[in-house]
């Protein structure tokens, strides 16, 4: 009998991957965690039935959430990562010798433990000496921090369940306070394509705009995320990613599978329907 993983993107659209075997299934205090093995996408894991990471396409997401801000400000030294229990965001950050400290706040320790065992491709740098792990609520963590970080990356789940608090006005305001005077905030910004995801995207964008003087959105194509069209938010107290001297990033000699400085410029060029959504977030 064939085994298929199926995710409902809407009540009328489903996405499926043929599964060779289920490697893990468990429930933490926060969510259900499943790990599957497939021929097409390698090992992948889901939270409450929603796709988080696959071995085959994780490089796209992690390249874009890390290298865009790092190319915008090459002097980033102290980083806070919220969520990111699979470790892929931390893995990419550790490639920068200039980074001195990475604090990672993940509410669910079991996610990290499972990814260490079944997804070493993404979790293999969590033991880097610059990395400190905090298993607590990211919303509460940033409340007590002020003027500490050069970069905050919010690598969260969708705006419901354990990740819901990471899409609030209070949270973004606390991130602003936790950043230094030239700090950058980057977050996964959902998809603009399906209505439910678009609502979450617009709500998050509106709240970030209320907090930061520089607020932009960029995009990537991620095959296993709903619609494949995925957005990221870029907010800053000072730096505009389109006016930065990003060519200096090439001098670092980092080998990436997705990100490059041409793509950096192009990813901020948005389709008209997305531009209209962002222009109308106040309505």
Curated annotation (Swiss-Prot):
Subcellular location per the Swiss-Prot or TrEMBL entry: Cytoplasm
Major subcellular location class: cytoplasm
PABS domain segment(s): 2-237
Top-rank taxon, per record: Bacteria
Annotated catalysed reactions: S-adenosyl 3-(methylsulfanyl)propylamine + putrescine = S-methyl-5'-thioadenosine + spermidine + H(+)
One cellular component term from this protein's GO annotations in UniProt: cytosol
Record-listed S-methyl-5'-thioadenosine binding positions: 31, 106, 137-138, 162
Function as written in the Swiss-Prot or TrEMBL entry: Catalyzes the irreversible transfer of a propylamine group from the amino donor S-adenosylmethioninamine (decarboxy-AdoMet) to putrescine (1,4-diaminobutane) to yield spermidine.
Similarity annotation: Belongs to the spermidine/spermine synthase family.
Molecular-function GO terms, alphabetical: spermidine synthase activity
Organism taxonomic ancestry: Bacteria, Bacillati, Bacillota, Clostridia, Eubacteriales
Keywords from the UniProt entry: Cytoplasm, Polyamine biosynthesis, Spermidine biosynthesis, Transferase
Positions contributing to spermidine binding: 62, 86, 155-158
PROSITE patterns found in the cross-reference section: PABS_2
Native organism: Clostridium perfringens (strain SM101 / Type A)
Catalytic residue list: 155 (proton acceptor)
Protein name (database record): Polyamine aminopropyltransferase
Enzyme class: transferase
E.C. designation(s): 2.5.1.16
Subunit structure: Homodimer or homotetramer.
Pathway(s) annotated for this protein in UniProt: Amine and polyamine biosynthesis; spermidine biosynthesis; spermidine from putrescine: step 1/1
Single biological process term from Gene Ontology: spermidine biosynthetic process
Gene name, Swiss-Prot/TrEMBL: speE
Segments passing through the bilayer: none
């Amino acid at each position: 009998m064939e085994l298929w993983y199926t995710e409902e993107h809407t009540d009328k659209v489903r996405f499926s991957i043929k599964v060779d075997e289920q490697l893990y299934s468990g429930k933490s205090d926060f969510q259900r965690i499943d790990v599957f093995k497939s021929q097409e996408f390698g090992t992948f894991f889901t939270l409450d039935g929603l796709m988080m990471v696959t071995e085959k396409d994780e490089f796209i997401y992690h390249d874009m959430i890390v290298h865009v801000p790092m190319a915008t400000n090459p002097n980033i030294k102290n980083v806070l990562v919220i969520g990111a229990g699979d470790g892929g965001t931390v893995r990419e950050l550790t490639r920068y010798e200039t980074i001195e400290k990475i604090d990672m706040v993940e509410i669910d320790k079991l996610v990290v433990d499972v990814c260490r065992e079944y997804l070493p491709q993404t979790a293999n740098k969590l033991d880097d000496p610059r990395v400190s792990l905090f298993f607590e609520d990211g919303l509460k963590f940033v409340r007590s921090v002020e003027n500490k970080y050069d970069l905050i990356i919010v690598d969260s789940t969708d705006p419901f369940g354990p990740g819901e608090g990471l899409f609030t006005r209070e949270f973004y305001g606390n991130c602003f306070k936790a950043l230094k005077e030239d700090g950058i905030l980057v977050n996964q910004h959902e998809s603009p394509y399906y209505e439910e995801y678009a609502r979450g995207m617009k709500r998050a964008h509106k709240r970030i705009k209320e907090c930061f003087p520089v607020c932009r959105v960029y995009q990537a194509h991620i095959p296993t995320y709903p619609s494949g069209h995925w957005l990221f938010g870029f907010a800053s107290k000072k730096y505009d990613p389109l006016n930065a001297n990003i060519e200096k990033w090439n001098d670092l000699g980092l080998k990436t599978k997705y990100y490059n400085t041409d793509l950096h410029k192009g990813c901020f060029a948005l389709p008209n329907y997305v531009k209209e959504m962002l222009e109308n977030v106040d309505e």
